[in-house]
C-alpha cells in the first residue's frame, strides 16, 4: 500500500515540472492575451478591438485573404501528398526510391533560407527568367508579392509533412486487399475511393488539421513574399504589435487566430472520438 502511494507521488512529481512549464509558457500568456484583447488603450474593458477587427474593411480583407490562402494551401497539400504517398507506396523503381529519400529535404532547411532561395528562383529577374533567356524566351513568373507565391512556398513546407502522415497510413494497408480489389475488376479510381481513402481518412484529417493550424499564423513567408495589402493575420499582428505598438488590437488578432485553430482542433477531436465510438459499438 505504501509503495503504491510512493509511486503515485513520484509520478505526480515527474509530471509537475511539465505542467508548470505549460502553465507559465502557454496558459498564462493565453489568459493575458484574452484579457488584453478586451481592453481599450485607456485600460477600460470593452469590445472595441473586436468591433474594429470585424468592421474595419482592411481587417476583414486580411481575414478573408488569410483564410483563402490557408484553405487553398490545405487542399493542394493533401492532393499532392496523396499523389506522392501513393506513388511511393505502389511504384517500385530506382526513381521512386530516390524520391522517397529526397522528399524530406525541405523539412531540414531553415524556413527563412528556403524562402529566400525560392525568391531567387521565382523573382521576375530570378533563376527561371535567366535560364529561359538563354533560349531567347522572356518569361516573368510574376509570383512575387502575390497569393500564388505564398501558396507555392507553403506547399514546399507542408507537402513533406502531409506525405509522411499519409504514407504511414498507406503502409498499413495490406497488399492482399489491393490485389483482391484488382482481381474483381476494380479500377484505380474505385480502389482509391472505396479502399485507400476510407482507410487513410483519419491520417488525412491529422494532416489537414496541422497544416491548417500551422499556416493560419504563419509569418516568415507572407512577410517576405506577400503584398502590402491585404496581408495575412500573422503579419497584421506583427504590425499592430511592433510597428504601431497597439497591444490591444494585436491581442485581439492573436485571440481570433487562437479561436480559429481551436475550432479546427475541436473538429478533429470530435471526428476521432466519433469514429472511436462507432468502433466500440461495432
Predicted regions and their residues:
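Transmembrane alpha-helices
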Residues: 17-26, 105, 163-166, 174, ...
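Membrane-cytosol interface at the C-terminal ends of specific transmembrane alpha-helices
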Residues: 140-182, 208
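Membrane-interfacial helix termini and adjacent extracytoplasmic/periplasmic loops
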Residues: 115-155, 189, 224-229
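Transmembrane-helix boundary motif in ABC transporter permease subunits
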Residues: 2-6, 72-104, 116, 120, ...
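C-terminal transmembrane helix and the adjacent membrane-cytosol boundary/short C-terminal tail
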Residues: 4, 13-14, 36, 88, ...
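Interhelical loop and adjacent transmembrane-helix boundary motif
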Residues: 4-7, 50-58, 216, 222-274
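Amphipathic cytosolic juxtamembrane alpha-helices at the membrane-cytosol interface
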Residues: 2-9, 147-149, 173-206
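Short membrane-interfacial helix/loop motifs at transmembrane-helix boundaries
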Residues: 20-57, 61, 121, 125, ...
